[in-house]
Swiss-Prot record:
Sequence similarity: Belongs to the MnmA/TRMU family.
MF (Gene Ontology): ATP binding; tRNA binding; tRNA-uridine 2-sulfurtransferase activity
GO cellular component term, pick one: cytoplasm
Enzyme class name: transferase
Record's subcellular location: Cytoplasm
Name of this protein: tRNA-specific 2-thiouridylase MnmA
Gene expressing this chain: mnmA
Residues where ATP binds: A23, L24, S25, G26, G27, V28, D29, S30, L49, G135
Species this chain originates from: Synechococcus sp. (strain JA-2-3B'a(2-13)) (Cyanobacteria bacterium Yellowstone B-Prime)
Length: 368
C-alpha cells in the first residue's frame, strides 16, 4: 500500500477530544458520519482510499467530494493509494472466480482485505489513531459475558449492510464505529441537510464501484476474459444452445439465456471444466442443503453442535430458517427448513439470531 504524498498534516488533538478516522467515500453516508462525530466532540480526520485504476465515479468524483467535505468541516483529509491492493484482492479475485464458474462476492472481501484492515493499520502507523468510523448501516456492541464484540443489523432493515461485514475480525470490530446503524436513511439525509454538507443531495450509488467504472459487470469481465464460446445444455446433457462465456451466467438466472423453450429454464449449475452452462426447470435449481467454507464466527465462539438460525444466501434475499451443522470451525453444512432456489456458489451465506449476526462463509459448489 503506497501512501499518497497529498496527505495533509494532522493537527494535535486536545487530550479531551478523542481522535478518530472517518473513512470517506465521497457519499452522503460517510460524509454525515464525519460531521456527526465532529459534533459529538471527536477530533476527526478523513481518509479516502484510491481504489480503481482509470476513471470512474468512485475514483474521481468520490475523491473530489470527500476532499470538499473535509474542507467544509475543517478537518484533515488523507488519500491512500490502494489501487494495487484492490487489483490483487478484488479485481483478480473476481476474474478468477467467474472464470471458474462461481459468482464471487467482492464487497465482503473488500471490507476485510482492502478497507478495514489496511485502513486501521494506516491510522495507527501514520496518524497515531486507533479508532475508525465508516458509513455502514450496522451496529456493534460488546458482550461482557462472552468477552466478545458482536455485530448486529442496522435499525433500518432496508439499508442494513451487516451481511457484507460478516468476515470482520474481533480486532476490526473493537476499533470500529458504525454511527449510522441507529439511523434510517431518511434521517441520515436530514442530518446531512442540517449540517449543510455539499454531499447532502448526492444520489445514492446503486452498483458496485466496478460497474460504475466499466458500465456493467459484463463489460468488466469481457475486458479480462473476452469471449469463450461453449454449449448450453439441459441436465440430461442435451445441447440447447450456445454461450459466449460462462462468466456471463450465474446460478438461478433466467433472463438472457438466449435459448427457445416451451417452459421457463434457469441456470442450474456452471461446468467450468467443460465450459458448459447447465439449465433446467426451477425445481432443479433448488437445494435442501449447502456446504459453506471459510467460515467466520463473528458474534459467538464457534459452536460444536447444531444451531438453529435464520440464514441469508444473498444480500437482498430474506432470511430463512435453517440448521447450521459444523464439520469444523471453518466449514459447516446448512440444512434449510425448505428447499431454496438459486443458492449460488461464491456468494456468502450469513446466519443470524434475530438482529445478531452469528457468522457466515462462502457457499461451495454442490456435488454434481
Amino acid at each position: 500500500m503506497v501512501i499518497s504524498p497529498h496527505s495533509s498534516v494532522s493537527p494535535v488533538a486536545s487530550p479531551s477530544r478523542p481522535r478518530i478516522v472517518a473513512a470517506l467515500s465521497g457519499g452522503v453516508d460517510s460524509s454525515t458520519v464525519a460531521a456527526l462525530l465532529q459534533e459529538q466532540g471527536y477530533a476527526v480526520e478523513g481518509v479516502t482510499l484510491w481504489l480503481m485504476r482509470g476513471k470512474g465515479q468512485c475514483c474521481t468524483e468520490g475523491l473530489v467530494d470527500a476532499a470538499a467535505v473535509c474542507e467544509q468541516l475543517g478537518i484533515p483529509h488523507h488519500v491512500v493509494d490502494s489501487r494495487e491492493l484492490f487489483q490483487a484482492n478484488i479485481v483478480d479475485y473476481l476474474v478468477a472466480g467467474y472464470a471458474e464458474g462461481i459468482t464471487p462476492l467482492p464487497c465482503s472481501q473488500c471490507n476485510k482485505l482492502v478497507k478495514f484492515g489496511p485502513l486501521l493499520a494506516y491510522a495507527r502507523e501514520k496518524l497515531g489513531i486507533s479508532q475508525m468510523a465508516t458509513g455502514h448501516y450496522a451496529r456493534v456492541r460488546f458482550n461482557a459475558e462472552l468477552g466478545r464484540y458482536q455485530l448486529l443489523r442496522a435499525v433500518d432493515r432496508q439499508k442494513d449492510q451487516s451481511y457484507f461485514l460478516y468476515d470482520l475480525s474481533q480486532e476490526h470490530l473493537a476499533h470500529s464505529l458504525f454511527p449510522l446503524g441507529e439511523y434510517t436513511k431518511a434521517q441520515t439525509r436530514q442530518l446531512a441537510a442540517r449540517y449543510g454538507l455539499v454531499t447532502a443531495d448526492k444520489p445514492e450509488s446503486q452498483d458496485l464501484c466496478l460497474i460504475e467504472t466499466y458500465g456493467s459487470m459484463r463489460s468488466f469481465l469481457d475486458q479480462y476474459l473476452g469471449q469463450r464460446p461453449g454449449e448450453i445444455v439441459d441436465t440430461q446433457g442435451r445441447v440447447l444452445g450456445s454461450h459466449e462465456g460462462i462468466h456471463h451466467y450465474t446460478v438461478g438466472q433466467r433472463k438472457g439465456l438466449g435459448i427457445a423453450s416451451s417452459r421457463p429454464l434457469y441456470v442450474v449449475r456452471i461446468d467450468a471444466a467443460m465450459n458448459r452452462v447447465v439449465v433446467g426447470e426451477r425445481e432443479e435449481a433448488t437445494q435442501a442443503e449447502a456446504w459453506v467454507s471459510q467460515v467466520n464466527w463473528v458474534s459467538i465462539p464457534a459452536p460444536t453442535g447444531s444451531l438453529a438460525v435464520e440464514v441469508q444466501v444473498r444480500y437482498r434475499t430474506p432470511p430463512v430458517p435453517a440448521m447450521v451443522i459444523p464439520e469444523s470451525p471453518e466449514r459447516v453444512k446448512l440444512q434449510f427448513a425448505e428447499p431454496q432456489f438459486g443458492v449460488t456458489p461464491g456468494q456468502a451465506a450469513v446466519w443470524y439470531h434475530g438482529d445478531l449476526l452469528l457468522g457466515g462463509g462462502i457457499l461451495e459448489r454442490p456435488s454434481p
